[in-house]
């Protein structure tokens, strides 16, 4: 197998599209710099606060900047959000009451959203548990069925939930902003008061527009994904209409307290500001990494989504690896080529919020940061790996090259007892990683 030829071909795929994504990064950086300049960001805003933090000007100023960037009435950017899932839950639970109805417009959401909703898995404190009605509209041919969504609207409908990213699904595409706008327009034509809520995780700054530019009333995401630029150590954000954001803030803190409290500890404020400034550039490093991965693994005969030449609307690259051991081997290769915990061997485990065991490769500086190069997937057929992130494209290249050499072509792989797939490669790091797996599962092989 001439891997160097495959890698060179993949680089050509990246270069063919680079100008488009560089232009997007340029325009989004201009938007952020303009907001920083308008709000006269200074070193003073990056100081830590303690206790109630009533007068945290840096926190409040960052809210204003996010509202400007996303063109919304208000924003809530806080380190007190423990994850993107938390921000999504706060946004929904803050704006819904018993008897209200939510329509899931993008089919089955990813696993952690299912626990927030309480369907199909019953969870204490979920929407369904609190008496909120949930209706789910399947997507058709990977696209939103706007007609079915609109037909499902009743007088009780309070919110339409839109998941931008594909999540752990190979049956749908990530939505572009224009498609989200079309759905929102259709919903608001029927009922302008319905809250169109977008889960924007993984999608920020991949396009020139955001869902709030095309009518979204409420939107949420994670700071250890795109908008944190690889520097934010924790946190999440909610942006949208003032009343919706206020309701969410009351859910995060307490009724009446809303966004007026919440200390910014340590160096977090600077990391939030600097991370946001870096975000458009870092997001495009991740996009280029995803294009490269798609090109390499499609050349090796694996199904990839999106395709190498497909326009990107988030930073996720899905690769169908066809077996559980291929999935494990891929994650091992990514982990071995990480800057942190490179000596660790990933293995499947039960993780809160997920219905199947999950395997993750995440040798990241910030735990769980998916804007840093990481890969994960549920241990279920067809064994898709979802790779995302990459603070630098160069790091992404190195890790993907190693994963390709470790797994080999889809049609010419050699199978071992236990269905571990290994190529006859002589790279010492790859051999050492494979030996760990073989030893762990008591396998036998003559091909190491």
Predicted regions and their residues:
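Short loop-beta-helix segment that forms the pyridoxal 5′-phosphate
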Residues: 67-91
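Active-site-flanking structural segment that lines cofactor/substrate pockets
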Residues: 46-76
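Structural motif
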Residues: 73-76, 100-103, 158-159, 193-196, ...
